[in-house]
Amino acid sequence: MFLTGCVSSLSAQQSFWKEDFSAGKLPDGWMIVDSTKSAKCEWIVTDQPYPGSFQFEQQAPPIASTSRGYHMQFRPGVVTGEEITKWNQREEYPNGYFQTSAIDCAGKNDVVLKFQHLFRWNNWFTGKRAGLWVGVSNDGVNWKEYNVMDKIPAATQLHAPVNEEINISEVAANQKTVYLRFFWRDIFSWYWMVDDIELTEPFAHDLALEKVTSHQETGNTFTKEDVLKVKLKNVGSQPVDEDFTVTASLNNGQKLTATVTASGHPIAKQEEYEVAFPATDLTQMGSYKIEFAIQYPKDERSSNNILKANLFAARMNLGKLTKF
């Protein structure tokens, strides 16, 4: 992690609250709420894989979070099984959440919630409020909620954890009692794993690369004029109002560069921005390893400036064979 010589930046990055579930049990004062009527469907603390269920027979390994081991896991797919249609006819969803005890954020002018999670969801008969919702409250009654499904398509099997960073200052800044809630809502299956929940104060200048938006990891159809796109986010406490570049280094030797003209259109705090690279020919190989990198001199944290991705074609066209 890159740290500047500025004392205020150094102190601003320190975590002031964290839970990694290494004790192997629900922390004192936390609660688990199951709103189903027909069967128990509760969050659990576990270090075990998702055991598999209808239409997803294989196990999903435990989340490969930074701390590894114990994590929070919700597995509605095991409960609904092959009975999703019947659950839908009853207009009942396997909804459930876990909630922290009160967290002291007094004296914190900016608060960022960070956590790692892994999930797979089924879009059969989803409800109007369907989503993976993270709620923040300073009274335990009124909640500001964020849907953290990150536009991941239904049935996508993620392998690497998704790193979430949400600026929750609107609710949490300078509050003595702050509660966090992780709520699976109006989806019948399959699972959600959460680990390494943390509250920090943000850097002033901090851009983060989040994910590739132009391609999935597998099943791609590469073209001669392919446009790679990647999403970044301003997770700092200040707007970004200077131009910077983002590079994409491919394992075939290509290096693409895109310029973000933030001087004309500043990127506000918590704003996301999609970077598009110049079109390139990706038909020559069936898979690619790509390293994306932000080049922004003011950035005070380098650990989130790099994103490594693997892209695989659905099939590879070998062209016309002239000899065998």
Locations of the language-model features?
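Short, surface-exposed loop/turn segments at beta-strand-coil junctions that are enriched for proline
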Residues: 106, 169-173, 280-285
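Short beta-strands within extracellular/lumenal beta-sheet-rich domains
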Residues: 85-108, 162-165
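Conserved Ser/Thr-centered positions that define the repeating blades of beta-propeller domains
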Residues: 100, 135-137, 249
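Extracellular/luminal regions of secreted and cell-surface proteins that mediate adhesion/ECM remodeling
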Residues: 145-161, 190-323
